[in-house]
Amino acid sequence: MKKNIFFVVASTLLLFSTTSIFAQLWDFSSEGKLDPKNMLIMNNAIQTDAGKAVNHMYNFKFDEAEREYRWFKYKYPTHPMPYFLLGLNEWWKIVPNTDNPMYDDRCLAYMDSTILYAERLYDDSDNKVEASFFLSAAYAFKGRLYSERKKWVKAASAGKSALKYLEKCRSYTDLSPELQFGDGLYNYYVEWIPKEYPMLKPILWLFPDGNKEKGIKDLEKVANNAFYTRMEARYFLLQIYGMEKQNEKAYQLAKYMHDNFPDNPYFHRYYARNAFLNGRGLEAEAEAKSILARIDHHMVGYEGVSGRYAAYILAYINQNYYRNFEVAKMYYNQTIGFAIATNAKQSGYHISSLMGLGKIAQTEGQLDEAISFYKQVADIADKKMPQRDEAKKAIEEVKKLKKQQKKGK
């Protein structure tokens, strides 16, 4: 799993804001103007339409979601909500492969429009809470995207703006579940980032301290008790459980997300991965094959990153459980192909696939070929990766075997 360096400072706010918006849809008068006295969650028509559209989006039915969002834009052309939803739609197109900049411009343009109309709403309304929701959300998404592109100064600036408007939302006490959600994300990641990336400590001086353990507990409360933010809390807990090596919890969540959004490739690959990590081999095998089939059929969002996960799972299972080395080699080579296509030569799946091919070659007595694979691992793998030392030891072991073979002749 790719660990985005600035990811949380932005995403903390991002998810608080996005789900808060859906929870706090406003009542409009017959003239289409916002009535600041009616900050409601009781507008069932808007709530239902937005909820259906968001579910389409999470299930990667982007055209269906966009139709609903554009209807909101037609009905409320000067309100930030439709522009934010359209930007959110573009963001989820980015999620399966965050290295792909194809949708960046559209996503940023919609977030800029959100900020424009939210600032006008903020200036024109006595009640600042709604506008602050959208300002916090839009800035958070911009910060998150800038962090993916390693534009750290822009990411920090956007994150700080998002924090500023998040604080303005706290005046509305009925938002406590959403605030706890945002606080939980913030507490976890603000402590996690400097431990994983010490070079970012100077940037994090701009932000309040966090508490990782409290953050997890807050998110679990939201995931179990909240209504509007429940799914988003589970989405982030899925990643957190993985980072904290809580594999059974990660598996249960991943399965739940995939069951609810079966065409979402991000949730699908997490489900396959966590089934694999938890020893559910048949389940992992079935889902990995399904992912590769969907890639072959060009289903929306299914591409090389998900393929990397799936092909590696199938390679490992065939090598270590079925002892079918020919099939294992095919899938390892497929994993390598996906890694190269997605500029991920230093990914764990690519490195481990080279190691797998080396071990198979060694088992089959192809010692020169085995050394070649191990050398690739030693050259490519980061110093912190255990495969690097493993490959170096394997090279020495194979060299000894070659010497023994020569002596025996």
Annotate each PLM feature.
Residues 92-103, 190-198, 246-249, 280-286, ...:
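Alpha-helical linker/edge segments of TPR/alpha-solenoid repeat scaffolds
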